[in-house]
Amino acid sequence: YLYGIKSERRLVEEIRLNIAYRWFCGFELDDAIPDHSTFSKTRTRKWQQSGLFQNAFYEIVKQCIACGLIDGKAMAADGSYIPANVSRESWVDVETEVEQSMQSYLDALDEELSQQPGFKKPPERTIKKRRTTSRTDPDSGYINHGNKRGIGYLMEATVDCKHGILTGVDVYPANEKESLLVLRHLEQQIKLGVPMNQLALDRGYDTGAVHRGLELLGVTGYIPAIQFPNAPEKYGFSYNPQRDAFICPEGVGLTYHRLNCNQSTGKYLRCYQIEDDACKHCVKRPSCFDKAGIRRRVLASSCYPAFFRGHQRVGTPEFLSMMRLRKIWAEGSFSVLKREHCISKIRKRGILAATEECLLAAMAMTIPFRCAPRHQNG
């Protein structure tokens, strides 16, 4: 992975011909080189399920932290689609049974939601769900988003913007949603001692749960705002963070009432409503809601206060600076990984093998920073 060697067969050939590789591996000039199957069988039988590659990667990250190469002052995280090594003819729709429950982003966030008025955990039930995968690599998933279309895997990675060093790598089927995965991806790094103060994400992560989850993790998030088509502001409502209330065009406050749960999706929304009879004689009542309604309500994200605080940072000098760093380091790191370190496509099959490939590529990208000579003052 350091030198772009894509297979065990080619690796064995390089060791056979390259004196430097022979010296590094401890082989004499006349020693026989082991067969390529020795490498592949050892990797799959002994190392793949041992957590060795994950532990080795985090050990390198810890050494970089100790050397001052990672400070966590500015970081960026993103997901990248990597195609699987499958043919179009192997695509197949499969029907699986999945347990449907509340959307879970982070344990601390779930605990906070459970304390809110109106919280009611939806009953867990098993539903049948169809998904597209491949007969040759059933762990992979199908994505059809923008210019990304195909069977593959999603690599979620975090990079420190001081030197562009990767601090976390996780791999999922491509059909998984990035915003549902990122908080646990970040939490795992924080538990391992990775410093994380400010984090830049793209607009795909602009959900109230992600904004609040970052606050619970002690991270200041910078996320571009999505222009939602039915936002309360579109109808003249404004949010007052001091009161945690929406103000209608007539100046009447809609206070937080309770959580509403969508039973089919497991998603929670905050219900804001007018508590008295102010709507009954309002001149704008006919245009505000239908005759069956008693008082005006507004449904917003279950973590709307944090969502609002995150949007207040949009457009600030700090926000613009973090967006520039995200474009340079997050997108740039993915480009280097795919171009120089053999993961433009996942060559092996199965999510364990895909994780192994991404971790080895990340280590190959990080090791040169750790080995580079530095001055005594760091």
Protein language model features and the residues they cover:
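Anion-binding and metal-coordination hotspots
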Residues: 4-17, 26-378
